[in-house]
């Protein structure tokens, strides 16, 4: 089994494109994404046919990170990990700052650095040398240059990089607008929007041409290090007592264009614990699947499907009836929004949603930066866990009776900022935070046993 990590020198360097090309070029790839992003893993699945897992040094301790990596590579030939932001960018300026470099050291994985070569010559060697010297425990084994106008220029830049840094160049990406993907909140389209499309077919052809003509695939594969994939799900002590614990129970997972943000490790944990996962679409289906013990609404883009969600009256009624019958319901971000009364859009349109939580949400034209990023969470049950927030909306009207329904989450960021959020009503829990179950298994057990 081989492993390699693709990082950018900075955001926008081209690491997602390079990762996608390499995932398309090699066979039977186990894809991974550093950090909490949901969109890139969807692309990984498009180009590999395999599920992608998030590797997050903030949400996971080192043993958990290694566990998710080792279980995620089972049966594959090569693990390709896509980084996040720039190689050393994380929280603060310590080297253990939950960055791509931090993850690479935990996993002892070689790094290929993608560098934007636009408008630069010999100075690119100084840039690469700085990355090499900044942390000698990060194994930068190769460089791929992006935005290169010609092979002649690439060879010129390659000479400078290799002469002054001792790190070999492994190829380049030519300037080509067709390599880019349109923006959508987190920076990309959702992968399902491209599935079976002509755009995807053309992109795969282009990726193949670039891989064959511009990248040294043989050397990249040689640089990727061998490692042992010992240990399965049931050998990880924090979850060993969960094996088949909930066998016979059924969880409905909302899955469509409006709700698609799920950590694959969360779903793996559900399957390991014996839960039967049944997917359904609040956009298309007329009612919930039968005999559910838990309904899981992940994040996504309900604002793009507000009309379909609003007009699907029978689905909303089915969800309200499940709530009245005591079925456990858990919602994150977009899923939380769907469980509220109404979503108000910027253009004046609105969607009437489930209304279980007597709250109105309003979209904003910019990121809610005050409540953005990694968060430490303490629940009303004194369970401490971790997650993140990322949303372009906010609560505009809150008619919930606070005497009966205090906020369930106490949030604190590493910089000391804090707030409360989340709504707990009967057997429903929902709020803006996206939560990794592996951050604290007790939270996962709470959803199944005590909610």
PLM segments and residue spans:
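Structural motif
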Residues: 5, 80-82, 112-114, 144, ...
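ATP-dependent carboxylate-amine ligase catalytic core
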Residues: 2-13, 17, 24-107, 115-141, ...
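Phosphate-binding active sites in nucleotide-utilizing proteins
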Residues: 240-324
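Internal gly/pro-rich beta-alpha loop/helix module
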Residues: 121-242
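Residues that mark the start of a beta-strand
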Residues: 3, 28, 248-250, 276, ...
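C-terminal and late-domain segments of enzyme folds
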Residues: 217, 244-247, 259-269, 362-451
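A short helix->loop->beta-strand "cap" motif at the edges of active sites that frequently abuts
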Residues: 109, 167, 324-328
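Cysteine-nucleophile active-site neighborhood
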Residues: 302-378
